UniProtKB/Swiss-Prot annotation:
Induction: Expression is induced by CPH2 which directly binds to the two sterol regulatory element 1-like elements upstream of TEC1. Expression is also regulated by the histone deacetylase complex HDAC3, as well as by TOR1 and EFG1. Moreover, heat shock factor-type transcriptional regulator SFL1 represses expression whereas SFL2 induces expression. In white cells, is up-regulated in the presence of alpha-pheromone. Expression is induced during oropharyngeal candidiasis (OPC). Keywords: Cell adhesion, DNA-binding, Nucleus, Transcription, Transcription regulation, Virulence. Gene3D superfamilies: TEA/ATTS domain (6.10.20.40). Belongs to the TEC1 family. It comes from Candida albicans (strain SC5314 / ATCC MYA-2876) (Yeast). Residues 1-20, 104-165, 629-657 are annotated as: Disordered. GO terms for cellular component: chromatin; nucleus; transcription regulator complex. Pfam families: TEA. GO terms for molecular function: DNA-binding transcription activator activity; DNA-binding transcription factor activity; DNA-binding transcription factor activity, RNA polymerase II-specific; RNA polymerase II cis-regulatory region sequence-specific DNA binding; sequence-specific DNA binding. This is Transcription activator TEC1.
Length: 743
């Protein structure tokens, strides 16, 4: 006969069976154990106050609760267990079937799962008396330290492990193995809880704003505990713990912090505490927004190697070799006439510690980098963003931008020793690639070109010809004008494999197979006034996935493009009522997949008239016109020099001048009261060979409609190689020949 489990402090009754004095409440918590059996926890009370709350929802202080494989089966499983104290349990709530899966081996502390199960079975068959004694012991209530609260359970005890000197129970499930903290408020969690109470100011019922986000006190406590210990405690757990501390009334200093917040002796202490609070929680909030936390790293010296993590660890598979391409060693500087004592304009800050940033779904980055949204369907292509902060001081006389400018960067790739043929076919340091570069001004394309023979692990210059012109042109501008010029410039570079199979010349010479694109480099710039701020920060961007469009209907789409006009920045805009779409527009459909650019050609891009644009795009166009107006401060001098170098083109110039006079009144320069700049005509083919408004038919059966091809050109290349001309235009400012090779 099993002994009856009786609470340690049963109220005394008189001879008539009545209690002496007022009846005291008896609180019983009911829970389901990990083996599906019911557990009861009895809380006796005095003076209408519960003495202590349960420390865990599954009553883990009853040593450990494990899977059925660890249990010592009862002699008669079909018999309904009888609780002499609390009555009879329903058989339907017992012996619930659980899947024993992924059982964890506890090493020296715990025996092997199979051996443990076999030993228990033999013990059941060979030692029934000892088993009965164990069951009787299990029916005895397990008490807390104060002896007032007991746990009554039918479940046998499994082996117990330890983590950071705290008992840990293993709970096998069908999905994964996990470690369960038997003490929710362990010493490290309690220490972090008390620390954060001394940081958070008391704000009554109002929430605290951190970086524009309203947070409650319990949420801040939860975030701090997770950042400090790596153990997550919910807001409800924090709230319950606060109520327990108040009810117990033992830690008066903590209760005072809960009720009144931290108290300061002087105003300086309050300011220092406020600053510390903002620093700590600003960092926690930033890490929480970016989706990572440095505090989640476990202490390797205190955690045995055989202990599992709280969840099954998802190992990062390095299956994509393109992710191993690193951008490094970037700098821009100006040397003196002897090639010594360089003045550093900017230098890379975090070449070895590049963090990833996932963009939100509503991020409008395509306004700065047209065509970037096409890469949303290509998550395997790495996108590296460089924020370049440039210092441009007043240079001494011995320094010259034209002679002393220097820039360099490298694309590093370490090929593994045992690389598979598939790995080598994707990326290899021994292969040469092509680099497509497109420069934008406030989202409008101004120049683009291709480079061949690009090799990895080699230092190369960063378009020095463009920067020499940029610094020499805008170096004398005001602080605001120079800052606006830097802010408006963005550069997109696409590294792709220039093999015969990469470009579909038989279908369209402007399309490149997406599988041949290896890397995308994005550049943004800003002007700084301090040398310590002249740093370049590198970040790996993760684009939000593109919503898949329905392909049930096959429709024919026609796109049309136009050549830039000779006498106006605005060019000849396409008719807004036409069903055709300008390929120079950045808002192309998913089937078009257009990236502005041109292979083996360099030309200027046209900007539509502001009157033909929707109201939402007009402010950006005004900024573009202001930026281009600054570029035309010296057009007459450069035009006179080019006319002296090109006397043979005088006849063609006169014919263009008459046409320019007719369009000068409608030019955007009239809005700013500026004279119409003279146009260089070296880049343009005579009118007899020019083609305007050329269109082609693009349907869903075209090879580019399956999103496997990417557009590298939005201009017609059927009238010859433009790079053979003597001049070309950059934002409607002409350059002499030889400048092309510098890019």
């Amino acid at each position: 006969m099993m002994s009856q489990a009786t609470p340690s402090a049963t109220p005394v009754r008189n001879a008539d069976g009545q209690k002496k004095g007022k009846k005291l409440p008896l609180i019983v918590d009911v829970a389901i154990g990990n083996n599906g059996k019911q557990l009861y926890q009895v809380h006796e009370s005095s003076k209408m106050v519960r003495k202590e709350m349960p420390r865990s929802t599954n009553f883990a202080l009853n040593d450990d609760i494990s899977d059925e494989g660890f249990f010592i089966s009862q002699i008669n499983e079909q018999r309904t267990p009888i609780r002499k104290t609390l009555g009879t349990l329903s058989p339907s709530s017992l012996n619930q079937k659980r899947i024993r899966h992924d059982v964890y081996d506890q090493g020296d502390d715990n025996s092997n799962d199979d051996n443990c199960q076999n030993d228990v079975y033999e013990q059941q068959q060979q030692q029934p008396q000892q088993q009965q004694q164990q069951q009787q012991q299990l029916h005895q209530p397990n008490m807390y330290e104060n002896g007032n609260v007991g746990v009554i359970s039918n479940d046998p005890v499994s082996s117990v492990g330890h983590y950071d000197n705290n008992p840990v129970s293993h709970v096998p499930t069908g999905a994964y193995s996990r470690v369960q903290d038997t003490d929710i408020w362990s010493d490290d969690v309690e220490e972090a809880f008390e620390e954060v109470l001394r940081l958070i100011p008391k704000s009554g019922l109002n929430k605290i704003k951190i970086a524009g986000r309203s947070c409650g006190r319990n949420e801040l406590i939860s975030d701090y505990i997770f950042a400090k210990t790596g153990k997550f405690r919910t807001r409800k757990q924090v709230s319950s713990h606060i109520q327990v501390i108040k009810n117990l009334g033992q830690k008066l200093d903590i209760i005072q912090l809960i009720n009144d917040g931290p108290i300061f002796n002087s105003h300086e202490e309050q300011l220092e505490s406020t600053k510390k609070f903002e620093d700590v929680f600003s960092k926690i909030n930033l890490n929480k927004s970016l989706g990572f936390s440095d505090s989640m790293k476990r202490k390797s010296d205190s955690m045995p190697m055989h202990l599992p993590a709280t969840k099954r660890i998802r190992r990062k598979h390095s299956g994509n070799p393109l992710n191993k391409i690193k951008f490094s060693n970037f700098f821009m500087s100006v040397n003196d006439q002897y090639g010594m004592n360089p003045i550093v304009l900017t230098i890379q800050q975090n070449g070895n510690d590049v963090k990833s940033l996932k963009l939100k779904d509503n991020a409008n980055i395509s306004s700065r980098f047209p065509g970037l949204s096409d890469f949303k369907s290509c998550p395997h292509i790495p996108i590296i963003h460089n924020m370049v902060k440039i210092l441009l001081p007043q240079l001494p006389e011995s320094y010259s931008i034209d002679d002393g400018f220097s820039s360099s960067y490298a694309l590093k790739y370490e090929e593994p020793e045992n690389a598979s043929p598939t790995h080598t076919s994707i990326i290899s340091s021994s292969r040469t690639y092509s680099l497509f570069t497109c420069v934008y001004s406030y989202g409008k394309e101004i120049v683009k070109f291709d480079e061949d023979g690009i090799q990895l692990n080699q230092d190369r210059e960063f378009i020095p010809g463009f920067w020499k012109f940029f610094f020499s042109t805008f170096g004398d501008q005001s602080e605001g004008g120079l800052s606006a010029a830097f802010k408006g410039v963005t550069i997109k570079q696409i590294l792709y494999e220039s093999s015969p199979d990469s470009v579909k010349k038989e279908q369209d010479a402007s399309k490149v197979n997406k599988s041949k694109v290896k890397l995308v480099l994005l550049w943004e710039f800003a002007k700084v006034s301090e040398c310590k701020d002249a740093l370049t920060t590198t970040t790996k961007l993760v684009l939000p996935p593109r919503a898949s469009a329905s392909s049930s209907k096959t429709t024919e789409e026609v796109f049309e493009y136009s050549e830039p006009a000779l006498n106006s920045i605005g060019g000849t805009p396409t008719d807004t009522t036409s069903p055709n779409m300008d390929l120079n527009n950045q808002n192309l459909s998913a089937a078009a997949t257009s990236i502005p650019g041109i292979r083996d050609t360099i030309h200027s891009a046209s900007m539509p008239d502001i009157n033909e644009l929707p109201s939402s795009a007009k402010p950006q166009v005004r900024l573009q016109k202001t930026f281009q107006s600054m570029q035309h401060l010296q057009p007459h001098q450069m035009w006179q020099q080019q006319q002296q170098q090109q006397p043979s083109q005088g006849a063609y110039t006169s014919s263009v001048a008459s046409q320019s006079l007719n369009t000068s009144l409608s030019s955007p320069y009239a809005q700013y009261g500026m004279p119409l700049p003279q146009q260089t005509i070296g880049t343009f083919v005579p009118p007899t060979s020019q083609t305007f408004g050329v269109s082609y038919t693009h349907n869903s059966q075209h090879p580019s409609a399956n999103m496997d091809l990417m557009m590298l050109s939005s201009m017609n290349t059927g009238y010859g190689n433009i790079t053979n001309n003597q001049d070309y235009q950059f934002g409607n400012i002409g350059y002499t020949e030889g400048f092309t090779s510098e890019f």
